[in-house]
């Protein structure tokens, strides 16, 4: 036996779930993903999403509506008469007609332990807040923002130096397995739903460019969490005067270090920076237009002495 599934997703994060559902023998009757976006060096090429590309390689039909405001789009969705829709990082709001457009509704894979970190950036926000655990939850979607009843939960530890990119890759695999397991249970009519708790609700707002600059006038642990929560994208950054001109430098890796001093000042010549309390060691950096470098390689091209100020 197998389910007929409409899959809805867009980024790389969604792809393992799609592949695992196909491997499990389910019939993917349609794949919905966001429309191709301008890309390439000059932005002249239209680039298909990772899910779009994966679906085509799997020989699956792909649909790319801008939204579901058009009645024709909603009718086409319902016409598939699918058993269920699986939604993983699709990125579009789903109206009630879509939420109720399959026999069993829509099940979403969300990268947090709900109700903590509902919203757009749960992976980054969990690390930036210093959480030591997070997870993947499969929930049945309702009209609210990540408020649906939980069908399945898988917890994942967040290591002290783990970056958002590393956590993303871990949750991507955990989430795929969780959704595949949930679909097996759904097929067997053995997928009980548990309403989310009413306490502990936090919202994971989309990362704003204005908050990516590093503020060394914060405690070292907060600075460290800020750096790893934004690595590798969009990247936390500071300004450094190079050749008489301020240049933006992204920090893609850090660790807590010993030391005290003026916030933003290098305490050593190997990139230990003083914070409001304590210090951080910058371990991976990237200058504008350059490639990411280990601290030792960065310093070969840009030597920095103790006492240098980072702002």
From Swiss-Prot:
Alphabetized CDD domains for the sequence: FMT_core_Met-tRNA-FMT_N, Met_tRNA_FMT_C
PROSITE patterns for this protein: GART
Pfam families from the UniProt entry: Formyl_trans_C, Formyl_trans_N
Lineage, highest ranks first: Bacteria, Pseudomonadati, Pseudomonadota, Alphaproteobacteria, Hyphomicrobiales
Xref: InterPro entries: Fmt, Formyl_trans_C, Formyl_transf_N, Formyl_transf_N_sf, Formyl_transferase-like_C_sf, GART_AS, Met-tRNA-FMT_C, Met-tRNA-FMT_N
PANTHER family: METHIONYL-TRNA FORMYLTRANSFERASE, METHIONYL-TRNA FORMYLTRANSFERASE, MITOCHONDRIAL
Broad enzyme group: transferase
Swiss-Prot/TrEMBL keywords: Protein biosynthesis, Transferase
Ligand binding ((6S)-5,6,7,8-tetrahydrofolate): 112-115
Gene giving rise to this polypeptide: fmt
One of the record's GO cellular component terms: cytosol
Function statement: Attaches a formyl group to the free amino group of methionyl-tRNA(fMet). The formyl group appears to play a dual role in the initiator identity of N-formylmethionyl-tRNA by promoting its recognition by IF2 and preventing the misappropriation of this tRNA by the elongation apparatus.
Name used for this protein in its record: Methionyl-tRNA formyltransferase
GO molecular function terms listed in the Swiss-Prot or TrEMBL record: methionyl-tRNA formyltransferase activity
EC number per UniProt: 2.1.2.9
Family, similarity comment: Belongs to the Fmt family.
Domain of life the protein comes from: Bacteria
Keyword DNA damage set for record: no
Catalysis: reaction(s): L-methionyl-tRNA(fMet) + (6R)-10-formyltetrahydrofolate = N-formyl-L-methionyl-tRNA(fMet) + (6S)-5,6,7,8-tetrahydrofolate + H(+)
Disulfide pairings: none
């Amino acid at each position: 036996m197998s389910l007929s599934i409409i899959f809805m997703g867009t980024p790389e994060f969604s792809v393992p779930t799609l592949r695992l559902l196909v491997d499990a023998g389910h019939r993917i009757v349609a794949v919905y993903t966001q429309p191709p976006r301008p890309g390439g060096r000059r932005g002249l090429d239209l680039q298909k999403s990772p899910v779009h590309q994966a679906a085509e390689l799997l020989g699956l039909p792909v649909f790319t509506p801008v939204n579901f405001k058009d009645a024709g789009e909603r009718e086409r969705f319902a016409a598939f008469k699918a058993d269920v829709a699986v939604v993983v990082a699709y990125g579009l709001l789903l109206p009630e007609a879509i939420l109720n457009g399959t026999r069993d509704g829509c099940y979403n894979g969300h990268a947090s332990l709900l109700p903590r970190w509902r919203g757009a950036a749960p992976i980054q926000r969990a690390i930036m807040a210093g959480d030591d655990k997070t997870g993947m939850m499969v929930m049945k979607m309702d009209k609210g923002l990540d408020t649906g009843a939980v069908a399945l939960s898988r917890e994942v530890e967040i290591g002290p130096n783990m970056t958002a990119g590393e956590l993303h890759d871990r949750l991507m695999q955990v989430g795929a397995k969780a959704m595949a397991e949930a679909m097996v249970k759904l097929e067997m009519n053995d997928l009980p739903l548990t309403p989310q708790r009413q306490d502990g609700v936090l919202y994971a707002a989309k990362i704003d460019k204005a908050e990516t600059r590093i503020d060394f006038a914060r405690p070292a642990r907060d600075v460290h969490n800020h750096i790893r929560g934004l690595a590798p994208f969009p990247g936390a950054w500071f300004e450094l005067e190079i050749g008489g001109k301020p240049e933006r430098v992204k920090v893609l890796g850090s660790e807590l270090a010993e030391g005290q001093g003026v916030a933003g000042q290098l305490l050593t010549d190997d990139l230990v920076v003083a914070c409001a309390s304590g210090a951080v060691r910058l371990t991976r950096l990237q200058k504008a237009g350059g490639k990411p470098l280990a601290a030792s390689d960065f310093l070969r091209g840009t030597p920095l002495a103790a006492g240098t100020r980072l702002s």
